[in-house]
């Protein structure tokens, strides 16, 4: 037996009904006024259809007939249609006036809701701007840069030229910390703090 998946919401039900009865229901443009008692006809025609229940049909029909598209179509001179698109009488003035009032009320509610949401968004924006301003730290006068005194160095004594001795290498632009790793007469191999090894003259090393 084939497993029929039920429709999930009124939107899907309306789309399905419009597919089954295209001369009666539409998804775009102005909707046609429906025959009075069309729910019963719809329930009977779809009685064996497992995709949709009577409860879903009733809810979907209520949503369809309260939409602006449908209410716009309920106007003087318009004719009601059945499921097959057959004309079932002209609309009564009472129904036309009721549709106009319902449409005006619905539009007024939407407009009021939009106005309320816009005001709420403005209020939230002001509150955020105020909070952001309060969180901003006061600007402090920039502190004068701390001038570090140059490290005073001296020439190495003869007995200080030993492997593992921490020294300063005079690079011309300043001193760099290093460690003696090898001594070969006047040439001394040192390792800088960054791991780089280099050979320098003994006269360039300072304590």
Swiss-Prot record:
GO terms for cellular component: cytosol. Residues 103-152 are annotated as: Disordered. One of its GO terms (molecular function) is RNA strand-exchange activity. Its main location: cytoplasm. InterPro entries: ProQ, ProQ/FinO, ProQ/FinO_sf, ProQ_C. The keyword Acyltransferase does not apply. The keyword Coiled coil does not apply. Residues 113-127 have a biased composition (Basic and acidic residues). It is found in: Cytoplasm. Pfam families: ProQ, ProQ_C. Keywords: Chaperone, Cytoplasm, RNA-binding. One of its GO terms (biological process) is post-transcriptional regulation of gene expression. PANTHER family: RNA CHAPERONE PROQ (PTHR38106:SF1). RNA chaperone with significant RNA binding, RNA strand exchange and RNA duplexing activities. Belongs to the ProQ family. This is RNA chaperone ProQ. It comes from Vibrio atlanticus (strain LGP32).
């Amino acid at each position: 037996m084939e497993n029929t998946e039920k429709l999930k919401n009124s939107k899907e039900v309306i789309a399905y009904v419009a597919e089954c009865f295209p001369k009666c229901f539409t998804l775009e443009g102005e909707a046609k006024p429906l025959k009075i008692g069309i729910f019963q006809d719809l329930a009977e025609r779809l009685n064996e259809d497992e995709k949709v229940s009577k409860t879903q049909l009733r809810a979907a029909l209520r949503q369809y007939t309260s939409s602006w598209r449908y209410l716009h179509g309920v106007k003087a001179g318009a004719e009601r249609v059945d499921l097959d698109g057959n004309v079932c009488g002209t609309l009564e003035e009472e129904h036309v006036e009721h549709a106009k009032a319902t449409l005006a009320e619905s539009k007024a509610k939407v407009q009021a809701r939009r106005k309320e949401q816009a005001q709420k968004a403005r209020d939230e924006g002001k509150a955020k701007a105020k909070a952001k301003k309060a969180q901003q730290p006061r600007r402090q006068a920039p502190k004068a840069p701390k001038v570090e005194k140059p490290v005073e160095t001296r020439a190495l004594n003869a007995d200080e030229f030993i492997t593992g001795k921490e020294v300063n290498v005079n690079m011309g632009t300043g001193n760099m910390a290093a460690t003696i790793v090898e001594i070969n007469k006047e040439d001394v191999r040192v390792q800088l703090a960054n791991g780089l090894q280099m050979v320098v003259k003994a006269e360039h090393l300072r304590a």
